[in-house]
Amino acid sequence: MNKTDVIVIGAGVVGAATARELSRYNLNVLVLEAGSDVAEGASKANSAIVHAGFDAKPGTNKAKFNVAGNRMFEDVCRELKVPFKRNGSLVLAFGEEEEKALEDLKAKAEQNGVPVEIIDQAELRKREPRVSEAATKALWAPTGGICCPYELTFRYAENAAANGVEFAFDAKVVEVKSKSKLKLRVEGEGEGEGWVVKTADGREFEAKAIVNCAGIHSDELNNQVSKTKYNIEARRGEYLMLDKDEDGTFAATMFQVPSKMGKGILVSPTVDGTVIVGPTAEDIGDKEDKATTYEGLEKVKEGAMRTYPALPLGKVITEFSGLRAHETTKGDFVLGEVSDAPGFFNALGVESPGLTSAPALGLYLAGEVASKLGASKKNEAIISKDVSYWPKTREMEPEELAALVEKDPSFGRVICRCEEVTEGEIRAAIRARVGARTLDGIKRRTRSGMGRCQGGFCTPRLIEILAAELGVAPEKFLLSRKTAPKELREEAAARLVSAKAQVEDYDVIVVGAGPAGLAAACAAKDNGANKVLCIERDDAPGGILQQCIHNGFGLHRFSEELTGPEYAQRWVDMAKERGVEIVCGTMVLKVDPTRITAMSPRGGLKSYRTKSVVLAMGCRERPRGALMTPGTRPAGVYTAGTVQRLVNMDGIMPGKKVVILGSGDIGLIMARRLTFSGAKVLACIEIMKKSSGLMRNVVQCLNDYDIPLLLSHTVTDVEGREHVTGVKVAKVDDNLKPIPGTEMHFDCDTLVLSCGLIPENELTKKAGIEMDPKTRGPKVDPKTMATSVPGIFAGGNVVRVYDLVDWVSRDSEIAGKSAALYAKGL
């Protein structure tokens, strides 16, 4: 039996904060977590708000610890290097009745010691011009803030581990008993002093004290040891997340007047630059049901539009839900030592404002435990402040970044293009003391896969890195979010030194070396450009066609039918024949008409001077979040392009029973490819009245293999907790709304999304180029492919999504010719 002084059950933000505070004492501390990582429960799925404290009932634990935690938050985040912003919060009133509620909130705030003021409509509109004109007044709370809850949890755990706290994951506690009931006697100790904890896999641990931070399951543990029973109801909240394009929509967190169920639908900026919308509040019986629902997401949209009538649903990048631990008998945080269970300490029913309260709760609980055990504090000089912090390259100055890449080239290899996360950051996240063991773990530590494509591009690379670092077969990361536990490893922080970026000169620089970029480069050369450079973020030129092993390309451009790799190679050869320089594995960070800034693991940070630029970054797939498909969030949901890469390039089959949502060409082609590889494609589901793909692909990829195409249907629910087990499908009406009573069910292990492509235009927007809201690409002159910024041209799918790659090449040649003429001053 493993013995320790203190066991903390649960590695959410409260458990991690408590562990960190306990690490300041001369105690042996073990954290047992049911999930495979920290922040697996409410700490990963909440509003990320640091509440001011005006809403909590005066005199309650919620009020006391909310205010105390808020005051500690800034210092804690600075110590742990966690992003935090005190942006303030506004509670909106719509009419006289709700204005009275603001007065009640103001009175509560004054009793709780929270500074607030009520502002009129004119002042509200001055501060927040985009707020609804129906809002008549607002309560302003300047001490409200925003943070990153999962990063805070991880950094708490990292600092605790640096001070000797041990963490055991996949360790669900199923039984807690006092030694007195087990009639255990340990030499040198009295009978009944301490506790024995048993996990689901049969492991047993012995401790002098237990801290119950088990979230929605904390009532179950309390009720095993105490006559005082509590009941926790899982309260589900559903959210939408908007793209970083919406950053700056509101400065403050925008609340509505709260109800007995919660603080209502909010619209708030995040520290990461996105906008969060939600949550709903629904009491459910299943403590594991984190599925989103059609009805819930509709409520989020409806509620948010009350605050923000212009809510841009086209900018939704993901949807998710979280479960709050709502205690029904007391309605407050239940804290401290249980009177009839000495040595057992509760942090029970910690719902909102639990995140805000976490620093104060950790301090309080650790103090209570230390006092009970008579533990002394460690010498302050030996307490580690290290949190295994690694550089965030997207936030670094150019000279600083260049020096880092020179020292460690992996920090120059961008894996996640949306969030500009490098291989070095990902490997550091895995190698941390409390390191990432899953795709979700990497996501929460680095933001890889959290951007607008939601992992559509980077997932295969992340799997490759995880598998190499952890010695686990890549397939395991497709089957489940959990992997076998591995010993924690330590890594020293990289030291940064000064260096200067290198500069080279060109006539035309093309961003992207897919068919569009290569065609533009060839045309530039053919029209008199002397030095032409293609910069490609992938490790080889050719773009997405390298994974399109089917034929059907080139009939219009080369008068012969080619496979994707053959078509790409044709352009690669033509570019090389003309003397076009191609640099791969290089991520462009900034575009100006006369200068390109890029980064690579080999060349570090480089600056290229140029006379003109062609943008040819291609497009990306619409992820599940943008579709707002309800259901759970298990492994087994992939975009068609991701499946195409896994099967065609990595030799990995994602599943055996497949449903395809959407009838885009990639999805249709993958239906045939998966069938060839031994999978059973059950159906292709299309919400519109006709397929969005080419008719020849419908015939050759579906009809020829007896795969049904269900038009005017959509997926209404994704089932499965760890991995997809099935989907529900329903007919839709003329407004694309599901028709009740038309549902059908498919047992499947994989859902493939083929629901359209979107031009990849992050660099375009950064360059200040005018965008076309219809195509979601840059506005261009069709005769020259010139953008609104002189000297910058664009070609291919970055402008609009084409049906055929031949037309991509054709229009990109126009862009390349125009760029060459511009460079010559013509």
Residue ranges and their predicted role:
Residues 4-30, 508-531, 670-674:
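N-terminal Rossmann-like FAD-binding beta1-loop-alpha1 element of flavoenzymes
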Residues 20-24, 80-86, 212-344, 353-363, ...:
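Active-site substrate-recognition segment that forms the wall
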Residues 24-44, 527-545, 685-689:
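Glycine-rich FAD pyrophosphate-binding loop
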Residues 48-123, 127, 136, 264-265, ...:
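Dinucleotide-binding Rossmann-like beta1-alpha1 core, especially the glycine-rich loop
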Residues 83-91, 105, 125-163, 194-197, ...:
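Helix-loop-beta segment of a Rossmann-like dinucleotide-binding subdomain
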Residues 111-117, 122, 126, 134-135, ...:
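FAD-binding core/adjacent interface of flavoenzyme oxidoreductases
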Residues 180, 197-198, 218, 230, ...:
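A Rossmann-like FAD-binding core segment of flavoenzymes
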Residues 262, 271-272, 283, 288-414, ...:
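C-terminal catalytic lobe of FAD-dependent flavoproteins
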